[in-house]
Design a protein with these regions (language model features):
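Conserved redox-active cysteine motifs that mediate thiol-disulfide chemistry
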Residues: 47-48, 55-72
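Active-site acidic short loop of glycosyltransferases
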Residues: 47-49, 79, 105, 126
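Alpha/beta-hydrolase fold active-site loops
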Residues: 50-51, 130
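Thiol/disulfide oxidoreductase modules built on the thioredoxin-like
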Residues: 103-105, 112-158
Length: 160
């Protein structure tokens, strides 16, 4: 009873609920982002394939380094049924576009704007980027916080 009004307790309770919501075994929360063409794309549009969901930004050097691994995975496994949805939090749209071109990121791209960014980051409990999830064809989260060789190995095993 005493904890019910305690701010620290409520923050921890909310964080635990968020982490449970986006843990492996849970359905990936659906959201929309704006595409390079100015349309909207939803995570639900990618059902039917395995998806690497990659939250990043052009100014984030660890994100840019990770995109090299994601590109290798995409090139190796896209034909087998793997897709990538990279979702940027960039404020500078030109920097976002340039990074995509410079890094050869030919897969699905989206950018979050304003309140939608805050909403999606809260939905997924994102406190830092890169933040990566792997989602199965039914929309269920099957991997989280995998990067580099661990992400490559995990995704390769999906098609063994």
């Amino acid at each position: 009873q005493q904890l019910a009004g305690n701010r620290y307790y409520l923050d921890m309770k909310n964080r635990a609920e968020t982490l449970t919501r986006v843990a492996p075994g849970s359905m990936a929360p659906v959201f929309t982002a704006i595409t390079l063409e100015g349309d909207t794309v939803s995570l639900a549009d990618l059902r039917g394939k395995y998806v690497i969901l990659d939250f990043w930004a052009s100014w984030c050097m660890p994100c840019r380094a990770e995109s090299v691994h994601v590109k290798e995975i995409y090139q190796k496994l896209h034909e087998k049924g793997l897709d990538v949805f990279s979702v940027s939090s960039d404020k500078d749209e030109q920097a976002w576009r340039k990074a995509i071109e410079d890094d050869g990121m030919v897969w699905h791209q989206g950018i979050l704007r304003g309140k939608n960014k805050k909403h999606v980051y809260e939905l997924y409990g994102i406190v830092g980027i890169p933040a990566i999830w792997v989602i199965d064809p039914d929309g269920k989260i099957i991997g989280k916080n995998l990067r580099g060789e661990k992400l490559k190995d995990f995704c390769s095993r999906l098609f063994d």
